[in-house]
From Swiss-Prot:
Keyword Zinc (UniProt): no
Statement: the UniProt record of this protein carries the keyword Chaperone: no
Top-level taxon in the UniProt lineage: Bacteria
Lineage, opening ranks: Bacteria, Bacillati, Mycoplasmatota, Mycoplasmoidales, Mycoplasmoidaceae
Name of the protein this chain belongs to: Proline-rich P65 protein homolog
Amino acid sequence: MEKNRSAFQQNQQASNQPFNQDQNQYYQDPNQQQFNQSGFDPNQQQFNQPGFDPNQQYYQDPNQQQFNQAGFDQNQQYYQDPNQQQFNQPGFDPNQQYYQDPNQQQFNQAGFDQNQYYQDPNQQQFNQSGFDQNQYYQDPNQQQFNQPSFDLNNQQFNQPGFNQSPAFEITPQEQKAEQEMFGEEPPQVVREIHELPFEKIRSFLQSDFDSYNFRLNSLKSKLDNALYSLDKTIQNTNENTANLEAIRHNLEQKIQNQSKQLRTNFDTQKLDDKINELEIRMQKLTRNFESLSELSKHNSYPNYYEKLLPNGGDSMTNVFEKALMMNLLRTTLPPQPQVQYYPQPYPYIRPYYDEPIYAGFRRRGYRDDFYE
C-alpha cells in the first residue's frame, strides 16, 4: 500500500508541474515532434537550425511539421485533425478546411504554385535555379541529375526531355537502313573445291539409291509373281472348259429325266412352277457357259479382258476380278524369297551397356560415344 501511495503522490506532483516542463506529458506519442527544450530528440526532424539534415525528406509525415512561431498555441493539440492545422497568422482563415487534399498542402508564399506542390509524390518539385521540374522523379528508376556525362540507362543526354520526345525514336525501318549502311557484313565462308566433303555427299546419295533400288526390285518381283499367276489361272480356265461341257451335258440329261418324272405326276400347278424354275436355272447355266467359252477363245494375255469389257476400258467388275485373282495368289502361292542382286549384310547393332552417366564436361542426354 505504501508503494502504491508513494507512486500516486509522484504522479500528482508531476501533474501539478507547469505544462511546458513536463516532457513526458506533453507528447505522449514518441512520433511527435519535440521543440527546442532540454531533452530534444536529435533523430527527429529539425528545421533551419544548425545540425539540420538536408538529405532528410522534408515532409516525412504531414502530421508532424511543427514550427516555432510566435503565437503558436502549445496547449492546443497541434494536429487533432490533419484537415485543420491552424496557425495564428494574419490572413489565415481558420474556418477554411486547411487540408482538403493532402496532396495540395498550400502555403501563402510568393511564387508558390499551389496546384503543383504535391500532385504526385514522385515529383516533389522545388523552385531552385537550374532545376528541371518536368524531369525530376518522373520515374524512380531513372533519377536524372544535371551532371555532365551522367548516364544511367545508356540513353540520357544533357538535354531536357531528350528521351521523352518522339522525334528521337528510331523506327525499325531506320534501324534496318542504318544496319545496311553502317553495319558489318556477315562473314562468308568461301571453300576451295577440294575442301568440299565429296565422300560424305556420295555416301548420302548412295544410301538413298540403295534403298530406292531395293524397293523397286521388290516391287518388280511382286509384279512378276502376279503376272505368272494370272497366266496360270488362264491356263486352268482353258483346261476346265472341257469339264464344264461334260457337267452341262449331265445336267441337261438329269433335267430331262426329272421333267419326264414330274410330267407323270397329277399336280399340274406344282409341275408348272417346277418347270419354270428349271427353265430359269437352265438359262443361267447356258449364260455362264457361254461366257466361259468366250473367255477360252481370247486367252492371250493381256488382251482377253478388253474384248470382254463393254467399251474396251477398265470397269469395277474387272477390278473386282483382279482383286480376286491377287487374293487367290496370296492364299495359294508360298511367299517367294526376294532376289538379292548384291550381298546385304546385317547392320551392325551397337551393344548397350548400363554405364554410369557422369555430369562433368558433358551435356545431359548424350551418351559417351557422342564425345569419342
